[in-house]
Design a protein with these regions (language model features):
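Long, hydrophobic, well-ordered secondary-structure blocks that form the structural core
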Residues: 1-8
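Catalytic core of non-heme Fe(II) oxygenases with the double-stranded beta-helix
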Residues: 8-76, 119
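Conserved double-stranded beta-helix
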Residues: 49-147
């Protein structure tokens, strides 16, 4: 929930992978109202992301980074009923909502059971929604101990 003028619900520019999420997941961002301008989130487009070497940008805080890349950030415009599926490796966040509309939104993360994890491991952070029978067979498989 992001109320107009509320400075307590801010997420400064970040990438979820910087906080331990797997680079092999995607996020479905679901706003429950029309979002635009400052009541939406911003994201660094993939084309710009690929041109920036974050290891070469001198910054100590999220605010420093925001100042360096702010001219490239794009605010998302989505109508109620639409969702954004995005690469959470891309820097994103929000700023103070300067509109008169409260933003209600939630997000869900999706990744394959078999894609690499980062700091947030299987069943520590993720719960499988659907495991196929072939996957269950593979999980249950025990290698015979031939002698």
């Amino acid at each position: 929930i992001q109320l107009p003028g509320d400075e307590n619900s801010l997420l400064p520019v970040h990438s979820d992978t910087w906080a331990g999420d797997s680079p092999f997941e995607v996020v479905a961002w679901v706003p429950l109202v029309n979002v635009f301008s400052t009541n939406a989130m911003f994201i660094l487009p993939k084309k710009k992301y690929k041109k920036i070497s974050f290891n070469k940008i001198p910054f100590k805080t999220n605010d420093d980074l925001y100042k360096k890349i702010s001219k490239h950030l794009k605010f998302i415009k989505i109508q109620y009923g639409e969702i954004l599926i995005f690469n959470q490796n891309l820097p994103h966040g929000n700023i103070v909502n300067k509109t008169n509309i409260t933003r209600w939104s939630f997000n869900c993360r999706f990744k394959s059971l078999f894609s690499p994890y980062n700091q947030k491991k299987f069943l520590e952070f993720f719960v499988p929604l659907n495991i196929k029978p072939a996957t269950l067979d593979g999980i249950d498989y025990e290698e015979p101990n031939f002698k």
